[in-house]
């Protein structure tokens, strides 16, 4: 209720929910964030306690759907990071030597408590990020639940190889925790990606100093509350809020932090690598994407159209995996374009808490302005806007929010700036192709190589194309169908290393070979 009030929406949410007949449940969760007025200031979570930043400074947290300030974020710096690292060092011995079953049990309790308070987390995520409430409720928060549960159990079943040397010796491998891990996550899928880094690090026996995006800190703050209630030992997880150039870089450059897992922009990833590599830290960097969505004439047409809507505009297009470049084989180009544009034009843009909303608010004013600048650039480069391209004013409490119509642009060259640079918003380009070689040239032309989508009924072609596309993930006749056991990451400037599955457990541990002579 406090979040709603601070978001400027408490006074109208009840009648709106009742009138629409949707299932917004304004429960009172067992989280002090929703019950305590003093929580208007978000706090750091250090050594098992909520605490103000050492410097006492805060900055505003904006609700992107209203444009209004609704909470204050700690402006943490190196002093706060020092406290967090000290707490993590003190906790490491006990946590790393704790039986795996006991560690697993604590992480499962955290998972269960997030699930029990799913509605509160989803509401907070929607208000903080601008995404539709239904998306937060059905995707983001359930995935956070799964992240903790998956790694809590995966760590119990991890095995390592052993080799016998013909009656001479036995070699076996130990995997030991690295110590303290630094985890820095982005604003687009806040709790989803924050927990995807934290969970494997903790499950491997490490302690963590983590920083969520300063744009969307709320659910990370709530996670700290959950960890206290779940009985996570003090100092095992420490959550620092603040700007990347201060708190974030203090984490990256700290000599006692052995590994950095970062998801965000490629330029920031480059800066992190320049800082951390000379210190010989382990690095996992999941960076930008400019993903191709390739549609052949033999596709399942209706499914390709419907799924392309999702892969283009889910979460306002603010997902690194969105297919922002659509390439359609010429025989069905006009048919596909007509069907696609017609459906895009019907997508409702507006209040994220409205159950009928498909496109919510852009996460911040600077990002809102960046997206608009790219729409203008596309027109300057000769692009024709087939639908969208304008800002939206939903009125009411959302009159000052950051809303943009889903936008489809035609007529651009494959190698123009609009098609080469990451926009990260509800903007896609569409163009025809004639041959496999041609579309491979288009698909692989960017500096990025994160994901790609193929639509074809020809299995031979699917295998052939998947092998030649320069990306870390290729979906065939689907999009964002994820198995937590599989590796996740990109090629080229889309990153270094892999997250997900046992690869994440490998990253947060060091291998040690032991050789015993018979």
Cite the ranges covered by each PLM segment:
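Intrinsic disorder/low-complexity segments
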Residues: 1-35
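Glycine-rich loop-to-alpha-helix module at the N-terminal edge of alpha/beta enzyme cores
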Residues: 68-158, 168
């Amino acid at each position: 209720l406090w979040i709603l009030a601070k978001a400027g929406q408490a006074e109208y949410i009840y009648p709106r929910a009742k009138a629409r007949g949707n299932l917004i449940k304004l429960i009172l969760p067992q989280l002090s964030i929703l019950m305590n007025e003093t929580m208007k200031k978000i706090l750091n979570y250090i050594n098992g306690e909520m605490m103000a930043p050492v410097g006492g400074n805060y900055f505003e947290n904006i609700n992107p759907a209203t444009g209004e300030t609704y909470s204050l974020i700690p402006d943490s710096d190196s002093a706060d990071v020092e406290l967090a690292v000290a707490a993590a060092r003190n906790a490491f011995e006990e946590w790393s030597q704790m039986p795996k079953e006991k560690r697993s049990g604590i992480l499962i309790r955290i998972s269960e408590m997030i699930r029990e308070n799913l509605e509160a987390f989803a509401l907070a995520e929607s208000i903080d990020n601008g995404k539709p409430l239904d998306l937060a409720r059905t995707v983001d928060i359930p995935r956070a639940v799964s992240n903790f549960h998956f790694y809590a159990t995966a760590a119990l079943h991890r095995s390592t190889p052993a080799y016998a040397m013909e009656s001479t010796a036995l070699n076996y491998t130990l995997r030991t925790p690295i110590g303290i891990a630094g985890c820095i996550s982005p604003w687009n899928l806040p709790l989803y990606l924050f927990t995807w880094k934290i969970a494997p690090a903790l499950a491997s026996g490490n302690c963590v100093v983590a920083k969520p995006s300063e744009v969307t800190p709320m659910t990370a703050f709530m996670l700290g509350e959950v960890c206290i209630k779940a009985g996570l030992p003090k100092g095992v997880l420490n959550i620092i809020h603040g700007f990347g150039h201060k708190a974030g870089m203090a984490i990256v450059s700290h000599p006692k932090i052995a590994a950095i897992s970062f998801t965000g922009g490629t330029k920031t990833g480059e800066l992190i690598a320049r800082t951390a590599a000379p210190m010989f830290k382990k690095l996992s960097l999941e960076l930008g994407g400019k993903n191709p969505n390739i549609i052949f004439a033999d596709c399942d047409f209706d499914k390709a159209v419907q799924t392309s809507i999702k892969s283009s505009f889910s979460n306002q297009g603010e997902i690194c995996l969105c297919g922002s470049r659509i390439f359609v084989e010429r025989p069905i180009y006009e048919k596909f374009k007509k069907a696609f544009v017609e459906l895009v034009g019907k997508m409702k843009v507006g209040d994220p808490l409205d159950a009928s909303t498909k496109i919510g608010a852009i996460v911040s004013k600077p990002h809102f302005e960046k997206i608009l600048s790219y729409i203008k650039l596309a027109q300057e480069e000769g692009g024709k806007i087939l639908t969208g391209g304008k800002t939206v004013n939903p009125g009411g409490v959302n009159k000052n929010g950051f809303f943009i119509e889903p936008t489809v642009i035609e007529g651009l060259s494959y190698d123009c700036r609009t098609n080469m640079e990451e926009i990260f918003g509800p903007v896609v380009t569409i163009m025809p192709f004639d041959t496999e070689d041609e579309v491979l040239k288009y698909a692989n032309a960017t500096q990025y190589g994160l994901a790609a989508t193929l639509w074809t009924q020809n299995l031979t072609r699917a295998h052939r194309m998947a092998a030649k596309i320069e990306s870390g993930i290729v979906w065939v006749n689907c999009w964002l169908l994820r198995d937590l056991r599989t590796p996740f990451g990109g090629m080229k400037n889309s990153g270094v290393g892999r997250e997900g599955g046992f690869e994440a457990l490998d990253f947060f541990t060091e291998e040690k070979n032991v050789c015993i002579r018979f």
